[in-house]
Amino acid sequence: FSDMERIAEEGYYEMVNMRLSKCGGFRNSLKMIDYLRDHGISFQVGCQLGESGLLSAAGRALSLLCSDAVYYDGSYDEFLLQENVTLEHVSFGPGGEAGPLKGHGLGVEISHRNLERLRDPSTAVTMSRP
């Protein structure tokens, strides 16, 4: 969050690219966006290149909460990924149109078969309850 404060204090930025995956999730993203709004700094809802359908769906939800964003970026998964971890395609439609996704939560279901096949076992973390 200190980056946002520095950006506001220095006054060098007219717009900030807000990426849900870089900001620590919904709560932090919305907190930072509110801070930008309070300081008169424009923002766009951005994305990471090659996001899966799950992150695209999350970005879509954030975009729908931020009608004052200057630009919306994301939902490229169908155009960039050979395989996805979601059952639904969440890529934008003709003219870049992308509205709310139907269904519960983020509006997507995970393909457990694809997730298992696409995961990188070398990065797996084992967690146990205390």
Q: Language-model segments: which ranges?
A:
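C-terminal extensions of enzymes
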Residues: 79-130
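Shared catalytic-loop signature of beta/alpha-barrel
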Residues: 1-97
